[in-house]
């Protein structure tokens, strides 16, 4: 018992003596990595007054500071930023061009066919819009608007719209972003094969139309659009100084109307007339629907023509006025 009491007393004395020694122990030194802070990158100098004025003039003129060429580098605070005014204008124009197809063309063609074929024609217009959108997303935009050969663009550069961002599209318009430009051109790709539907109405099934459009986009539209509109296209008289044919196709006279018109004629010759044509009366289902569709096409054409200026500028205004007079 005495040994136990002595042991406990000795342990208490040792604990009491060691406590102040532990309290006075110096703290561990801070790691060297935490003490040294990473150097901050130098801040870019703000542009001076003259540069700011040049930026505003370039924005209004839809170009880059110090150059009328939209391909020049924009070395300013506005670098990598698309112009909100031009971008907003182009988004409205893109919606108007889609409005021409859905529901403009669908109602226009639906009113001209017989009652039993109205739904078929409308479904074909909607089906084409969805199909072409997928093709455009996968590789269509890349085949048309990337640099490749004079006949066709690169398959992979913008595949799945990779790299198509909100940054300015310096190949075609410095103050319109790449994604907005891509969506605007998609609406042209949608309406072009949809125009062919009217020539083969009541003579091709829905599945046959979609198969034809898929082949036609790769065989006709993508190569022709690149040759006329591509930055290194064979017939691009605007951007390609080495173009063999100096064509200026402002709003798709060649890419949209000639391609769809000639293709529709070929299809008509292959398919022949409708069964009973010239023997059985084939009255239009509804001229009211046809008239409504015509009005929608008129409205949508402002986006089609004015938007082809790729800027809210004087050229777009001139196209807007000319479209009104031509329609009247």
Regions found by a protein language model. Give the residues of each.
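Hydrophobic alpha-helical transmembrane bundles of multi-pass membrane proteins
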Residues: 3-8, 20-328
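Bacterial N-terminal signal peptides
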Residues: 8-16
């Amino acid at each position: 018992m005495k040994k136990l009491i002595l042991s406990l007393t000795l342990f208490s004395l040792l604990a009491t003596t060691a406590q102040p020694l532990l309290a006075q122990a110096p703290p561990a030194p801070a790691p060297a990595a935490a003490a040294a802070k990473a150097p901050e990158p130098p801040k870019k100098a703000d542009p001076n007054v003259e540069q700011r004025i040049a930026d505003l003039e370039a924005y209004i003129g839809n170009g880059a500071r110090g150059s009328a060429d939209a391909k020049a580098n924009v070395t300013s605070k506005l670098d990598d930023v698309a112009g909100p005014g031009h971008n907003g204008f182009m988004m409205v124009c893109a919606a108007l061009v889609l409005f021409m197809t859905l529901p403009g063309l669908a109602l226009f063609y639906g009113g001209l066919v017989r009652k039993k074929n109205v739904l078929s024609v409308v479904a074909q217009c909607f089906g084409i819009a969805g199909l072409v959108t997928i093709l455009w997303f996968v590789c269509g935009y890349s085949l048309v608007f990337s640099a490749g050969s004079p006949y066709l663009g690169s398959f992979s550069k913008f595949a799945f719209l990779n790299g198509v961002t909100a940054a300015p599209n310096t190949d075609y318009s410095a103050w319109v972003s790449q994604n907005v430009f891509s969506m605007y051109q998609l609406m042209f790709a949608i309406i072009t094969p949809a125009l062919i539907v009217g020539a083969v109405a009541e003579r091709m099934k829905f599945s046959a139309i979609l198969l034809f459009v898929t082949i036609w986009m790769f065989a006709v539209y993508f190569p022709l659009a690149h040759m006329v509109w591509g930055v290194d296209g064979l017939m691009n008289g605007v951007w390609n100084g080495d173009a063999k044919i100096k064509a200026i196709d402002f709003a798709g006279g060649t890419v949209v109307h000639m391609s769809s018109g000639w293709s529709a004629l070929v299809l008509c010759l292959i398919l022949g007339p409708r069964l009973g044509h010239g023997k059985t009366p084939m009255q239009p289902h509804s001229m009211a629907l046809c008239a409504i569709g015509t009005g929608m096409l008129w409205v949508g054409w402002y986006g089609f023509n004015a938007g082809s200026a790729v800027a809210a500028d004087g050229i777009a205004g001139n196209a807007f006025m000319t479209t009104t007079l031509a329609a009247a």
